[in-house]
Amino acid sequence: MGQEDGNRGERRAAGTPVEVTALYATDGCVITSSIALLTNSLLGAEPVYIFSYDAYTHDGRADGPTEQDRFEESRALYQASGGLNGDSFRVTFCLLGTEVGGTHQARGRTRPMFVCRFERADDVAALQDALAHGTPLQPDHIAATLDAEATFALHANMILALTVAINNASPRTGRDAAAAQYDQGASLRSLVGRTSLGQRGLTTLYVHHEVRVLAAYRRAYYGSAQSPFWFLSKFGPDEKSLVLTTRYYLLQAQRLGGAGATYDLQAIKDICATYAIPHAPRPDTVSAASLTSFAAITRFCCTSQYARGAAAAGFPLYVERRIAADVRETSALEKFITHDRSCLRVSDREFITYIYLAHFECFSPPRLATHLRAVTTHDPNPAASTEQPSPLGREAVEQFFCHVRAQLNIGEYVKHNVTPRETVLDGDTAKAYLRARTYAPGALTPAPAYCGAVDSATKMMGRLADAEKLLVPRGWPAFAPASPGEDTAGGTPPPQTCGIVKRLLRLAATEQQGPTPPAIAALIRNAAVQTPLPVYRISMVPTGQAFAALAWDDWARITRDARLAEAVVSAEAAAHPDHGALGRRLTDRIRAQGPVMPPGGLDAGGQMYVNRNEIFNGALAITNIILDLDIALKEPVPFRRLHEALGHFRRGALAAVQLLFPAARVDPDAYPCYFFKSACRPGPASVGSGSGLGNDDDGDWFPCYDDAGDEEWAEDPGAMDTSHDPPDDEVAYFDLCHEVGPTAEPRETDSPVCSCTDKIGLRVCMPVPAPYVVHGSLTMRGVARVIQQAVLLDRDFVEAIGSYVKNFLLIDTGVYAHGHSLRLPYFAKIAPDGPACGRLLPVFVIPPACKDVPAFVAAHADPRRFHFHAPPTYLASPREIRVLHSLGGDYVSFFERKASRNALEHFGRRETLTEVLGRYNVQPDAGGTVEGFASELLGRIVACIETHFPEHAGEYQAVSVRRAVSKDDWVLLQLVPVRGTLQQSLSCLRFKHGRASRATARTFVALSVGANNRLCVSLCQQCFAAKCDSNRLHTLFTIDAGTPCSPSVPCSTSQPSS
């Protein structure tokens, strides 16, 4: 091998000189010394230290050399004892700096100062001594070998710029100053044509303008201020990193190009750490701490074994191999994410979680350690490299992406993420369960007039109180209604309170005991009623809420103007054998009839035929799967395309139903699925001001009645989980911009366009297949999410409507919380300025194998098809029922499950809120302790409000605390103005709303567990206006509760209410 290296050295000596790029320094100011050398003023020049260098040759080979050839050629440059092989050298001396001017390549990190040609024996010997042992080069050697032409070509632009700046030259025309004009075509070079740009020009400038010349060069060569300690701290501290990283990062990367030229310093140092080349101990005992001068650091680097031989020759090649291995393994991640971006139909928030999880799974510390062990080499020779194939990409696919692939198949998704739990009832037990847990058969049977209790919220509270007075002697619990802002500061805590909704739902679901009339008979004043009964919320005009519990109703009055005669349906079915065309034709006929809103009245009894929202009762069984679809749009959807998409939606939903209810017989080609869509608005002129659209509440917030509003949180706070679940917004905020369609009867070929521009509101109703019923809010929420997953995995659905949709969070699951409500089909919503709009009308999606089209069309108007708790058709004689009471598993989100597992594995267990509050001597289960603790923290919260929201600070001077939601890791407490104060409501802190009715907001203090298991106290608000996301909870600021032993904080202005 030595003979071969010698032959290569002889061939090189006869050819071109060895190219050397040297990073140098001096003991004093390197810029002053360098200019002295350039101007041939050797008295001001200092010896030059070369502490890092790069050597290469230009062989001019036409064929690209292999990696092994490059290694051998590079190793042949280095002498075993130090220095370089060769008889002549062209050395470019550099300092830290950047070349001026744009380029498509990576910018260099050094800037050349002068070029020298070492050809004479004594000069070459001096250079070899400097490279091998760190001996400083004397100024006379630099001056004797200076290549003036090449050197001053580097400085021509600098000399020219200095000449122009010093002489204030500018290109202009005109003989005097008054006539002078700027000449854009004039060349600056023509103005300084008599100025020498070589050594003479620089010398002249330096002699006459030394300060400006030094300042300019110091700005251009910002390496002039670097000290030995700077280089040691940046590129060290160990010997290998100091020598190899400095050489590659500053000198070799730009010359070699490739990805390495774009890597930052830390990345190169990380690569250097896996270049584990063995070497003998240094003969000296020099430590990094002793390298306090350039003489010491130069001697240390030049005598290092990493600066010569195979170790020096192999490192640049190893950087290329290591980068290629990293990119190869990580590109699998990029490819999967790119693929999933177009086919993994999840919400934006969930996809972001997926991206973070993918990177965490692939680049977790254990996997990275395995990868680094695989790519570590112990031999610089590429032919003998000890690197192994890295398992990083393969493990990422096996451990993460294979599970993600399972999300793209609904069967695998249910298999891995859903564990249904059901209870089987038969005979009399099944019959008794259905009678006790579904609406009484007469409740949804058409009748000439309604029977029930209907009244405004205020009057309903009084009627409930009167009914409860009759029931209390018979064992009914007493509830005292709480008025908004009730002041309890000066006395005993108030009696137990409960809102309208909870009391109504409890009355409506209570069974009849023997011959005694049911409890709700005391409210309805009719002993013949049977329970359970449906409970409704009604939006009044212009504002306010009403409530109803109905034993029966005149359903024909509600649906008669939006129904088709059986003869018409039969005729259309005979004329249009294609069910898709038939469904669109029948839908167009409904629209062409011009359904009008039933006349409403100022009283609740009339208004309930305009707007009605079924309140979900968590105590009852669910017999109809009612889905609330809110499709956010990029642009309007052609109706034909929308209708086709709904057909694909039906197919995907039924695929999920078959998997969730395996004991049921579900024929996907014949099973009924009913669709209703909010009527399109005819135009802005008919709807009112655009600012009013979208502000109506189709959900559960009762702005005028805090006790009713509190009921929204009473049973199932999970519906508004702002920490983990996707936002569950109510349908009213999305549907309000829709109105009744045109009256003209379009032809099928017209392909009408749905005029909804922002969102499409839909109801999808499917009977729970016999013999199943569903029980529980969480179970129903899980069913809806599995159905959404199945629909989004239907390729035809995504292709049909995907280009029109902004995001794929389609189904709102917040409606399945106890006490939440959902607008019924055939009813409208109430716009903020009063008129009813957006009536939900049928869209007929006829099953492919439907045998009786008229019956299917008529079933859309059957109230038993679109109520959550309607009595099933087999109620009279059920042989067996299966109660699905839990989906178990992690159906909520595969990505959330992975995130939770990773957090536990890598960051330790997060304490529960109960454990954290226990350190403050607060017991969440003990009455009033959490409220009292929050009251103590109010002083700090009010101080923040005074600082950041000074105009609202006065509203919080007299507030009390009332618990709203309690969870294992989250407690929400509402701030309520004390009764009797001037301010009886709290204003929105996020925005200034034009309308006073929109300025009112509910304000909460949230207690949660933050990082490092510390207690976090957040101020949150829920504002009704669309500008504030329509009742969505927003966190305004968060403070740290401090350590339990910290001094007590200022207390609030009143005692907490229970």
Curated annotation (Swiss-Prot):
It comes from the Viruses. InterPro entries: HSV_PRIM (IPR033685). The keyword Zinc applies. A zinc finger (CHC2-type) spans 988-1028. The record marks D628, D630 as: Essential for primase activity. Essential component of the helicase/primase complex. Unwinds the DNA at the replication forks and generates single-stranded DNA for both leading and lagging strand synthesis. The primase initiates primer synthesis and thereby produces large amount of short RNA primers on the lagging strand that the polymerase elongates using dNTPs. This is DNA primase. It comes from Human herpesvirus 1 (strain 17) (HHV-1).
